[in-house]
A protein has these predicted regions:
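Conserved PLP-enzyme active-site core in the AAT-like
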Residues: 2-306, 312-327, 335-348
Length: 348
């Protein structure tokens, strides 16, 4: 019995399998007994390397999924009465079933951001009512890198947000489910990105892992409650060695960066090919592992007969096509052929 699709999916990087090196690491860790809950050598090594690469003076905590990472990270920064400023498109607002609100009892103060990126000016629009007990008081700004639209903040943009937040008594949480893709695009280090947040997540699942994320706490002063909140929120794995082994493999020889760079390159190849197909419009800059495009609704329906992908905005006829660490050039070229055929174009 198999649930695998016969041709490469462009629906999500979550559709991809596990990188062979990560799978080998899991199997190799599956020998004998190991201390549970993070007392194993795989987790110790992975956490130490994450701290080194990020420059964290605090700690790194391995968790099971992205929503859990976001809730834990936000919870470490929020006061009981405080709210979160985020883009309307932020994953914490659109795709996490109200997890932050339910678990943390917080309120999300959303801001329209066409390209998914906040700016100091946009953040300031949610300052109405600051100091008034009748209003939710912003305490954290949550940004996503890369964003839900595949765009990336430049390092200067991140620094501007961090400095603005510091000047206005706000903490910064960075949702880094696809942080590796941003690092690959910007040609920067993990520390370059992490230094512009107080707490951030560092994604593994979308980048070749089977299922693991890290919550990186940059300042030691923010760590005292982290272990307890992780347990309360159901994110402490008893057999932690299998999470640690995954990150250990990803961090060996910069596999995390190579995987992301490859996924980005495949998205860029797809975007370049689309430029040769009339009637297809790429609607956001292609800076990570995703292409958003507008095309005729009839062509979308035709293409979906043979290929898996998501219609992002049905009213605007915008689709989302995602690549992954295991997407091959031949997959992209075959998909481009399918797009051209659906549009009635013969590719040369």
């Amino acid at each position: 019995m198999t649930g695998a699709v016969s041709r490469k999916s462009f629906g999500s990087d979550n559709h991809a399998g596990t990188h062979p090196a990560v799978m080998r690491a899991i199997v190799e860790a599956n020998v004998g007994d190991a201390i549970p809950y993070g007392g194993d050598p795989w987790t110790e090594k992975a956490v130490g390397e994450i701290r080194r690469l990020s420059g964290a003076q605090g700690e790194a905590y391995l968790v099971l999924n992205g929503s859990g990472a976001n809730v834990l990270g936000l919870g470490l920064l929020l006061g009981r009465h405080e709210a979160v400023i985020c883009a309307e498109s932020a994953h914490i607002n659109t795709d996490e079933c109200g997890a932050a609100e339910r678990v943390l009892g917080t309120k999300l103060l959303t801001v329209p951001a066409r390209d998914g990126k906040l700016t100091p000016e946009l953040i300031a629009t949610r300052f109405v009512g600051r100091g008034d007990e009748h209003f939710a008081q912003p305490g954290v700004v949550a940004i996503t890198q890369s964003t839900e639209f595949g765009t990336c903040y430049s390092l200067d943009e991140l620094r501007a947000i961090k400095e603005f937040c510091a000047a206005n008594r706000l903490r910064v949480f960075l949702d880094g489910a696809r942080l590796a893709n941003a690092a690959a695009y910007l040609g920067c280090t993990l520390a370059d990105l992490a230094g512009n947040a107080d707490v951030l997540s560092f994604g593994g699942t979308k980048n070749g892992a089977m299922g693991v994320e890290a919550v990186i706490v940059m300042h030691a002063a923010d760590t005292p409650n982290a272990r307890y909140l992780r347990k309360q929120q159901g994110q402490l794995s008893s057999k932690m060695r299998f999470l640690g082994a995954q990150f250990d493999a990803l961090l060996t020889d910069d596999l995390w960066l190579a995987n992301a760079a490859h996924a980005n390159a495949m998205a860029a190849r797809l975007a370049a090919g689309l430029a040769e197909i009339p009637g297809v419009e790429v609607v956001y800059p292609v800076q990570s592992d995703v292409v958003f495009a507008r095309l005729d609704p009839n062509h979308i329906a035709e293409l979906q007969r043979d290929w898996i992908f998501h219609v992002w905005d049905e009213g605007a006829s915008v689709v989302r096509w995602m690549t992954a660490f295991d997407t091959q050039e031949s997959d992209v070229d075959a998909f481009l052929g399918g797009i051209a055929a659906a549009a009635g174009v013969v590719r040369v």
